Amino acid sequence: MVQSTVELWQKNLHRAKQARDLVFDYALGTSLITLLPIAGYYSLRLLLVLFLLVKMCRDIGKIWQFPRGQDLLAIAGNIFGAIGAVITAAVVWVTLLAIGIWVPYFDSFKGFAGLFTLTWMLGQSTNQYYANGALGHRFHQPVQPDQESINHGHL
């Protein structure tokens, strides 16, 4: 059964919304881990956050059905997106730490904001990577003319 272009776009828009909502949920979840009032256990928190980040990337791939065949730019974009996510999260963390010097209790949210930023940016980068693969396979394949069109000179 051949799907129309409109149906494919609607399906892909639905997938993109699902992935964006999933990324937001994971971003809130990972950032809330830093607000747990448990002293110590930083290694355990870090492992839990890393597990959630890997699971989020895998769940985004499931939404897009793990498409293959991304071009080199999509792969490089995903790698640089992950590096950019780490750098931006570190900048957010340091910024809130610096503001916390002058505004009391402000630095207590540095971990929350940093992990939210990291998760959100990594999720969006991963979403774009899988969306690129899914859209590339469905919309950029050449259309094969049928034999009847060739015989009647419609091409």
Curated annotation (Swiss-Prot):
Similarity section: To E.coli YdgK.
Keywords assigned by UniProt, alphabetized: Cell membrane, Membrane, Transmembrane, Transmembrane helix
Membrane topology: Multi-pass membrane protein
Chief site of localization: membrane
This protein's name: Uncharacterized protein sll0481
Segments passing through the bilayer: 33-53, 83-103
Keyword Transmembrane included in the entry's annotation: yes
Gene Ontology, cellular component aspect: plasma membrane
Domain of life: Bacteria
Subcellular location: Cell membrane
Source organism of this protein record: Synechocystis sp. (strain ATCC 27184 / PCC 6803 / Kazusa)
